[in-house]
Amino acid sequence: SVESPSQKTSVQISLATNLLESARAEIAPDSHLSVYRLGIEPRGSQLVLTGDVDSVQARVQTLQRFKAAGIPLVDETVVLPASGLGDATWGICNISTGAGREKPSHTAEMGTQLLMGEVVRIFKRVDDSYLSWYLVQSSDGYICWLPPENVVRCTREQADAWTSKPLLIVTQFEAQVRSEPRADS
């Protein structure tokens, strides 16, 4: 029996999807600790690899698996951080406790918490019609989504300068931070 073009495409998609899931299990087994959000998309007679990864190595290893299996595809993966962020791919949590969400939604499960002053790596920004979110990696390695108002973006150098400064702990219920010393404070 001869396969029709749609049957052939369906078989290719199935093989490619299985190969991608196998690669994900080995390259990025814990989705809480690495970004490996890839998918297979059919476009005409071609298969397209789309999505995000957090390292060049993850992308290369994935592409090598497809090549070794003889499955041709068009690569449209993005290695994060996203180029649109410029040099400010780091951030500092600016609220007492930041709720790191599993998905970019306030109703999504909380995956981790960030403390004020904690430095995060910013991978990308997602905007919808009402809200924006950053995909970040916390200092303990967890990947989560934070609203932009919970993070002050900065460069790697600024983040390093921040972490090299002494830590101040305020034990009063109410305090004020002033830019200069005052005799009456």
Residue ranges and their predicted role:
Residues 4-44:
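Gly/Ser-centered flexible loop/linker motifs
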Residues 1-2, 54:
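N-terminus-biased targeting/localization segments
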Residues 124-132:
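Short, conserved beta-turn/loop elements at beta-strand boundaries and strand-helix junctions
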Residues 6, 60, 64-85, 105, ...:
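Boundary regions of SH3-family modules and the immediately adjacent low-complexity/disordered segments
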Residues 21, 60, 64, 112-115:
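Solvent-exposed, polar/charged alpha-helical surfaces in well-ordered, non-transmembrane soluble domains
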Residues 93-122, 170-185:
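Beta-loop motif signature
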